[in-house]
Amino acid sequence: VVFQIQWAAYLLNSPILSMSGNETSVVYIPFLRKFNPMDSITIRGNLVDCLQRTILPVQMEVRNGKIAAVHSTESSNIDPNLPYILPGFVDAHVHIESSMLIPSEFARMAVVHGTVATVSDPHEIANVCGMEGVQFMVENGKKVPFKFYFGAPSCVPATVFETAGDAIDAEQVKALLGMPEIKYLSEMMNFPGAIAGDEEVLKKIAAAHALGKPVDGHAPGLSGEGLVQYIKRGISTDHECFTIEEAREKISLGMKIIIREGSAAKNFEALIPLIDEYPDQIMFCSDDKHPDSLVEGHINALCARAVAKGYDVFHVLRAACINPVNHYKLDVGLLQVGDAADFLVVNNLKDFKAEATYIDGVLVAENGQTKIQRFIDNINPVNRFGIQQLDVSAIALTANGVYPYPVIGCIDGQLITDKLDLHPAIQDGFYVSDTEKDVLKIVVVNRYFSAPVAVAFIHRFGLLGGAIASSVAHDSHNIVAVGVDDESITKAINMVIACKGGVSCVGRNKEQVLPLPIAGLMSAEDGYKVAEAYTEIDQQAKELGSGLGSPFMSLSFMALLVIPNVKLSDKGLFDGEKFSFYA
């Protein structure tokens, strides 16, 4: 990469060259609240223009954080000796909270992979802390040179069938949408309400439309007349498609499809053929991505996989860079003169490994290392946790003799579950876990106040010993736990309670917990250290027998009622097809 830095007015406590006459000295410019971009940078490389579908060797000038000029060289052929300059990657739908990191730490890791912006739905923290939680995300995101674009959570709480920490009504949604940092109405999970014309739902949608802001969808499996009515409400996207047929139907009715590949839900393989079929209507997202996955890659990894399968590189980059910017009207540059200087530099168009990432002309990552310093001052640990330690008797379930028993069928890599009718084991008059049949006890505990514990059973989780628990439990974020015996389950839950949030694992000879004191969802610690700690506890869960790709992430979705078929809330076992509790 050829960089000619003529003057730098920004740096995060790292050295730059100061040139005065014939003297050159190393100076340090302290951390600034406002990130002043480099005054002038000249970069030579093969510029990938996704709008014109061209790749040309150029000399690009950046001044005051903008693309000031792009000068073509004498040759119109790609120069193999130069790197490629691409628009920055955008994650088109992500819950930052699922990374277990506060926004400023998420940014430090994401820029290493060429990500310059996210379309972020803060409904996880909103379900715990309401408006205060949304404000926390917005303010913390401003601390670093990264482009966080947040949505106004549309469904807090997600349903009336669970206990959340707060609620956000239509008037509060309207107030949020009036903020410049809030770019859209977040996923409308209450698609039955939207279809039926629920007054509160329609008020929220109308508030977004009045300001010209898009409305995100959430409609897994919805088709036919119900889908038609849902889209007629002005809902423009969906990231919940599990089959290509479902996605094609939604596209035919005017929706844009966001291909999701997260730590739990993985729909890339099923949906990637859409990239060449509908290049203007496809985006990429992670939705929910744990910190260990973020260390490995982000949107760049999806680009690499798509190109390796033979899909058109310009179509791939449209999904990763262009379409989110256009759809959500983001202030993210697309390498046109006058645009914000948001771009990355790569050595090839195969692995998309970012050699350097720039945001508003600021070098934020280079050679696999973040250039963004940690922001550690004045972090307010917003949280709501109101329960005491649990006694083992609280999760005992008396056998009532009713057979068969409805059991959650866990599916690795998916958020949907199977509805199974199985026979849990009975011991001394109580239903208990059965490791031989892989039918384990699953528990959801109300974290906000003392209440009866909800108990059910889950198949295909795979634990052979111990238990795991988490206060990350979509969407109300009560405590969810699964295990092979009541003592281990209770111990894992109490470890989470003691930290006022976190993930825990109780094994035969080892117990560990990763504290998440910010809303019981996030840590303010260094993101890479959190990723290390999470990798260790995730590995312990797998050593206990779980064959799931991400046991904690899968567990966190077993309480998500808005995705069928069978889930467990703090109020009981829920039938996602009938949208009611089991009797």
Label every model-predicted segment.
Residues P122-I125, P153-S154, N190, P220-G221, ...:
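Short, ordered loop/turn segments at secondary-structure junctions
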Residues A107-P214, V513-P515:
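Divalent-metal coordination cores built from histidine and acidic residues
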Residues E23-V58, V62-R63, A68-S72, V111-H113, ...:
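Active-site microenvironment of metallo-dependent hydrolases
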Residues A167-E187, G193-I258, S263-F284, L294-K309, ...:
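Histidine/acidic residue-rich metal-binding segments in metalloenzymes
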